[in-house]
Amino acid sequence: DLHENSFEDEGYRKFLGKVLTPLTPFIKDMKFGELRGLDFGCGPAPVLASMLEEEGVRMNMYDPFYAHNLSVLEQSYDIVTCTEAIEHFHAPHVEWALFNKLVASGGVLAIMTKRVLDKARFANWHYKNDVTHVSFFSEATFQYLAQRDGYDVTFPASDVVLLRKR
């Protein structure tokens, strides 16, 4: 297991802030404790879930290896996060269909992953050389999925996408 993320690692918390910061306006629109969230692919240390709980979001966690609780996949959520996990999906269309069920109407799907910029740069891209990275997405891919499945999409950082379900 190569995961080195921990609750005490301020650098990791700052890294996750790239997802948390653009979610803050959405969180502030709701009463403290009323939002329900799911950290999908939380890993062994669900730091983002903890950070969201500090903001008043009631969080559940799911990870096929570290938090394999299928019952949390049977409800819908105001916020679903998927940080540094989607690139590991061997059948991303399956998880995407699940995301469409998990995100409540008006809810937000927040994804963090490096995006493909163009074919030429992909050839020399270090990110694809990680053998566990098997799925890659571009801005155009997320725009297509958003249009097809009823989301408004924004790109608040080079590796963050927010999709708000209409």
Per-segment meaning from a language model:
Residues 66, 87, 116:
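Active-site micro-motifs of SAM-dependent methyltransferase domains
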Residues 48-49, 91-92, 120-122:
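Short glycine-/acidic-enriched loop or helix-start segments at secondary-structure transitions
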Residues 112-135, 140-141, 145:
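Short, glycine-/aromatic-enriched active-site segment of Class I SAM-dependent methyltransferases
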Residues 80-92:
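A short SAM/SAH-binding and catalytic strip from SAM-dependent methyltransferases
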Residues 1-79, 96-97, 129-130, 140, ...:
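Conserved N-terminal segment of class I S-adenosyl-L-methionine
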Residues 56-57, 107, 151:
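Short phosphate-binding/catalytic loops that engage adenosine nucleotides
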